[in-house]
């Protein structure tokens, strides 16, 4: 229903409406904020971030933290929300509940590959770390410090 509303009433293209609907999780107000914000490529940003974390490429994580710091608060929140949603999708994939997955296309391909290296314990720990980072961001902590700290902790979690 929300996706149809965004397409019909707001004139948003189908692929973008699907992404917004997935992020908003039924919250119309949040979906409208996402629709009004500039198009950002959370999927690509997340994929690059997780690859750097998995490879423990700490040198590339510093510029990523600087880029994250340069985003506005809504974009930072959107990336964290997106990251948490991908962890959820990965958990569903590992659990065999693929009929509940909302991902499509390249995002689904990444989740299929990502689920091969993730375990329930890694997802639980990553989810907790991301929620903690989101909490600190909401309390106006330094986005660069929070993102870099989260990245290092995720690198240790994903590839111990």
Language-model region placement:
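Charged, glycine-rich active-site and insertion segments that engage polyanionic ligands
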Residues: 1-82, 86, 90-160
């Amino acid at each position: 229903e929300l996706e149809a509303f965004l397409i019909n009433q707001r004139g948003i293209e189908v692929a973008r409406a699907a992404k917004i609907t997935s992020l908003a999780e039924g919250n119309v107000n949040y979906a409208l904020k996402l629709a009004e914000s500039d198009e950002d490529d959370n999927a690509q940003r997340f994929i690059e971030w997780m690859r750097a974390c998995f490879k423990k490429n700490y040198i590339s994580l510093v510029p990523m933290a600087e880029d994250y710091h340069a985003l506005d608060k809504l974009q930072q929140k959107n990336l964290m929300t997106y990251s948490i949603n991908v962890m959820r999708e990965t958990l569903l994939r590992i659990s065999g509940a693929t009929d509940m997955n909302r991902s499509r296309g390249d995002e689904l391909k990444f989740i299929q590959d990502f689920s091969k290296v993730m375990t329930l314990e890694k997802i639980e720990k990553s989810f907790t770390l991301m929620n903690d980072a989101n909490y600190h961001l909401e309390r106006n902590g330094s986005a660069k410090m929070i993102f870099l700290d989260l990245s290092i902790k995720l690198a240790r979690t994903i590839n111990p």
